[in-house]
Amino acid sequence: MGSDITATPAWQALSRHHDEIRAKDLRGLFADDPTRGTGFALTVGDLYIDYSKHRVTRETLDLLLDLARTAGLPAKRDAMFSGAHINTSEDRAVLHTALRLPRDASLTVDGQDVVADVHEVLDRMGDFTDRLRSGEWRGATGERITTVVNIGIGGSDLGPVMVDQALRHYADAGISARFVSNVDPADLVAKLNGLDPATTLFIIASKTFSTLETLTNATAARRWLVDGLGGSAGQDAVSKHFVAVSTNAKLVDDFGIDTANMFGFWDWVGGRYSVDSAIGLSVMAVIGRERFAEFLAGFHLVDEHFRSAPLEANAPVLLGLIGLWYSNFFGAETRAVLPYSNDLARFAAYLQQLTMESNGKSVRADGTPVSTGTGEIFWGEPGTNGQHAFYQLLHQGTRLVPADFIGFSEPTDDLPTADGTGSMHDLLMSNFFAQTQVLAFGKTAEEITGEGTPPNVVPHKVMPGNRPSTSILATKLTPSVVGQLIALYEHQVFVEGVIWGIDSFDQWGVELGKTQAKALLPVLTGADSPAAQSDSSTDALVRRYRTERGRTA
């Protein structure tokens, strides 16, 4: 049997402490410590992180840090950074942090100079995107490229989509990006709508160049391009309108892409950790190699903080442990991520894959069952949209939902308010600060009664407060800050995975469904009535589908 973290004295001490503290509220904690608002906060790079509105005391944090040490967090963190094979089920190193090492750094893993490999790919990406952005790279008809379409799925899509939207203000070369992921043809059709084949370039992002959804979309895109250009130009166009992010040179060549325009990455990069690799080629095409370097530098800044800061002043460690505190001791199952920036509209969706694919595991790294809940469920929408949708549940519902608020002092865009005298960004951020305040401190029946509210309405207006949140405030949404935010959450995922004893870097749970889909496709499309399926529900669904498609049921 593997080591059971819940059987350790550190876990049991936390359990006893939870019994003692769970009745305390944030009003009382702030009243007891007038300096709490600044004492439970720290600055990492451009991020000011306020964790004072959490249901924790100094003792809570000390006990959580004892748990981290009991689980061997410092040694396991060092093992990750050094290139040890901590992805045990696949016997792989986990080196997304190497993707943002500076050129003069040194890291050799399994006999390979990792830093040299990373920068060789970055240099090739930079040279390619320089040609694209300057207009030197031309399509088959001699026109310059104005749109790149990234075709990928999962980590090959969610990261680039999110970062492209977040950094839209840094698009400075007349190139825009679109993203196709879903095998539903509606996705590709919508994204190609209005595009000119002569000025469109496709990036096919698939490590193996065999991902079903990606290759299906890529083949349809190739047909659209060839048909759109017509004649000999269409037949010869693939090499000038398609590039690949892959490691399978043979299949890339078979598709018609010049392997000189293939950008690779490595087995030690998981898809959900890959936006700062060649998977970010579409981002670099839009914002340029210098801004992309700033993006990588933001990651590296937080990497170095996570690697070297004392545990008690280490932002990813503290935030990861606080997330685990709610998940395992308060029974909270979800965490809301609420960016007060419309440019971060896809950040919660990006974090869903990062966190839930990483820590959605029911066995420990040694294959034995876990003894406690794992994997926070992440969700969210930008403020203030969420305030008019689901904040009601956050404020007055029966479920505890810790929330992360992310905001910026300087806007990427600003407009005057209705009377022409104020700033819409100030209005946005007043909501940010108000929501964290009301979640924490609420409003009592006595306060509401004192305002003259009818007695029968008072219970409906009571805001219980004591709803925890983290506030992350940065000066402005820049390439570096986006990198810092991503790394902050990457390392929280690692911290929680270490405590739970799971492998946060495999994803076997996604495989069986893909295999079964391949088996079911001929059942859906075959000319003859299919054999009965193994369960009556699937059998009935398949037959109804075939009937509605005009096929023999």
Swiss-Prot record:
| Keyword DNA-binding belongs to the record | no
Renumbered residue ranges of the record's region Disordered: 527-553
Presence of the UniProt keyword rRNA processing in the record: no
InterPro entries, from UniProt? G6P_Isomerase, G6P_Isomerase_C, Phosphoglucose_isomerase_CS, SIS_dom_sf, SIS_PGI_1, SIS_PGI_2
MF term (GO), any? monosaccharide binding
Biased composition annotated in UniProt, kind: Basic and acidic residues: 541-553
Q: Where in the cell is it found?
A: Cytoplasm
User: Which of the seven top EC classes does this enzyme belong to?
Assistant: isomerase
Catalytic site residues?
Answer: 357, 388, 514
Give the catalysed reaction(s), semicolon-separated: alpha-D-glucose 6-phosphate = beta-D-fructose 6-phosphate
List the GO cellular component terms.
cytosol
Q: What is its EC number?
A: 5.3.1.9
- What biological-process GO terms show up in the record? gluconeogenesis; glucose 6-phosphate metabolic process; glycolytic process
Key words of the record: Cytoplasm, Gluconeogenesis, Glycolysis, Isomerase
CDD domains noted in UniProt: SIS_PGI_1 (cd05015), SIS_PGI_2 (cd05016)
Pathway, per UniProt? Carbohydrate biosynthesis; gluconeogenesis; Carbohydrate degradation; glycolysis; D-glyceraldehyde 3-phosphate and glycerone phosphate from D-glucose: step 2/4
Main localization of the protein described in the UniProt heading: cytoplasm
* Protein's job: Catalyzes the reversible isomerization of glucose-6-phosphate to fructose-6-phosphate.
Listed PANTHER family: GLUCOSE-6-PHOSPHATE ISOMERASE
The entry sums up its family as follows: Belongs to the GPI family.
* The protein's name: Glucose-6-phosphate isomerase
